[in-house]
Amino acid sequence: MSLDNELPNRPRSWKVLLHHVFQIPKAFLDNEEKSQEYTYELMTESPPEKLKNSSDIANFGEEISNRFIIWWKKSRDSDFSKQVPTYFGMTSRHELLERTVWHSTQHIRQLQSLLENLEIKPGEIISNEQMKGLPLTQEIWDEQKM
């Protein structure tokens, strides 16, 4: 299977979805660290040319994860009620962080489902307990079940 293959019933490739899982928190971090406005275009940015295979995407994800850990250590005691501009209007830093978490989580659920359909067991899965409290739908996909 190629990462350029389209997902079932989606106009999106595996590569785009895998990248998007990490691009969402990257957009959040760019907003936090660089005061870059949280735009739809930033959040949905296409994978750069240098991301050619799953290892490249995993490395990108590791980079974002490390950035997040460092950011959180510096920011956890800061004012999360502060308002920030986004493509969907002004919102609190807390709301944007929560939205970042559930948005990426929803796509991870989709990836887990796709892998399950291919009879591939991920090394780690997100459990229902870990998702408790996140505003996620019961359904993994918007439309029909895949």
Where are these regions (language model features)?
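Amphipathic, heptad-repeat alpha-helices with coiled-coil/zipper character that mediate oligomerization
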Residues: 26, 63-73
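Intrinsically disordered, low-complexity segments enriched in polar/charged residues with Gly/Pro
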Residues: 58, 72, 86-88
